[in-house]
Amino acid sequence: MRSIIYVIMATMVSLTMGTGCAQAQDKALDKTTEVPKVYLIKEISSENLIKIYEALSRKAEGNVAVKLSTGEPGGHNFLQPSLIAPLVQKVKGTIVECNTAYGGGRANTEAHLKAAADHGFTAIARVDIMDADGETSLPVKGGKHLKEDFVGKNYLDYDFTVVLSHFKGHAMGGFGGAIKNISIGIASSGGKAWIHSAGQTKDISKVWGNLPPQDDFLEAMAEAAKAITDHCGDDILYINVANNLSVDCDCDSSPEDPRMGDIGILASLDPVALDRACTDLVRLSDDHGKIHLIERIDSRHGMHTLSLIHISEPTRQEAIS
């Protein structure tokens, strides 16, 4: 059976307009701006990861960072190395991560590299824990909560970023996809605390007992993502794999088992359109198990970051074989 690529058209044209926070008041929406596309292939395979990457028509060149989650020890839903290896190797990518801010098995570089090795990632590519030698900051233009985003120092060594995200639920954000992966994921350990506290502290010993209102955290996460998109310009692309759809993130050492079936591989040059497409497909699914993931998303107000985005009805195109 030949794969089908769905091209989902969105009226949202930028992360700025989509989040409703960073620079939302900057400019009116330009009606002539190109509408972003989201591609979907239902069958999840290494071959189709490469096919959907090529459909984006944006070549990853130079020193390429592949941002993904190596998964917390004890977890099992993260993207498997056997699935992603051909794509990572095709782009000659380095798998990049930053240390966590909540303790656990990836809170320092030595433990994080061990987790990456135990999960099979070091066998397919070089793994760079980008904040092993410190952090640097990127400006957040027009941010409500953040004026700068603290990222792993080594991130500046890369020319292009392939954002390869496992779409699933998340205990704090409601769901995790491309936006979470480039915001909290690229943030240093202290930068993660900075986002979670909506710009109040980088001290990981203080953040968890003094969390801000939920919407402030979600807006800060969007602002940090905007810092990454501004930094990268056109040297970035986004792929979400919507499988193992647990309500819990890959940062959870004991995630709940998925209650609904896999959706497929989605890709876009626009992270907001991509994450919105994933959440739409969860809601449109005929799988009764979706109620658990929807409850997780909505109970955390997870759509707040995407609340100004309006996705039109999907159109279909047959994939090039």
How would you describe each model-predicted region?
Residues D30-A85, K90-L308, S312, R316:
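Extended, low-polarity segments enriched in aliphatic/aromatic residues
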Residues M1-I5, C278:
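Positively charged n-region of N-terminal signal peptides that target proteins for export
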Residues I320-S321:
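Hydrophobic alpha-helical segments, chiefly the membrane-spanning helices
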Residues A22-D26:
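Boundary at the C-terminal end of the N-terminal hydrophobic targeting segment
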Residues V7-T16:
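Bacterial N-terminal signal peptides
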